[in-house]
């Protein structure tokens, strides 16, 4: 399992400079499915789910409690809900 995590981290890093980043991200997802590993949330936010390309210069906006990430390659918009971390203080 440790080898699989190292391989996933290597693939996400190499996808930023690779000539074929779709292949790197596809391999990363296949390894995580085969080994039953949930990808880290930070890793999932580094690439577009539709075109499997790492974000190069995404347009990021905040709107109505969501973070909108617009992919510069395929034009897909990803919506991520902003978590409310306010905890009521004890009285």
From Swiss-Prot:
Record's cofactor remark: Binds 1 zinc ion per subunit.
MF terms (GO), sorted A to Z: ribonuclease P activity; zinc ion binding
Catalytic activity: Endonucleolytic cleavage of RNA, removing 5'-extranucleotides from tRNA precursor
Enzyme Commission designation: 3.1.26.5
Keyword Transport: no
Cellular compartments per GO CC: cytoplasm; ribonuclease P complex
GO biological process, one term: tRNA 5'-leader removal
Coiled-coil positions: none
Names of required cofactors: Zn(2+)
InterPro entries (alphabetical): RNP4 (IPR016432)
Keywords: Cytoplasm, Endonuclease, Hydrolase, Metal-binding, Nuclease, tRNA processing, Zinc
The keyword Metal-binding belongs to this UniProt entry's keyword annotation: yes
Family assignment from sequence similarity: Belongs to the eukaryotic/archaeal RNase P protein component 4 family.
Physiological role: Part of ribonuclease P, a protein complex that generates mature tRNA molecules by cleaving their 5'-ends.
Subunit comment: Consists of a catalytic RNA component and at least 4-5 protein subunits.
Name of the protein this chain belongs to: Ribonuclease P protein component 4
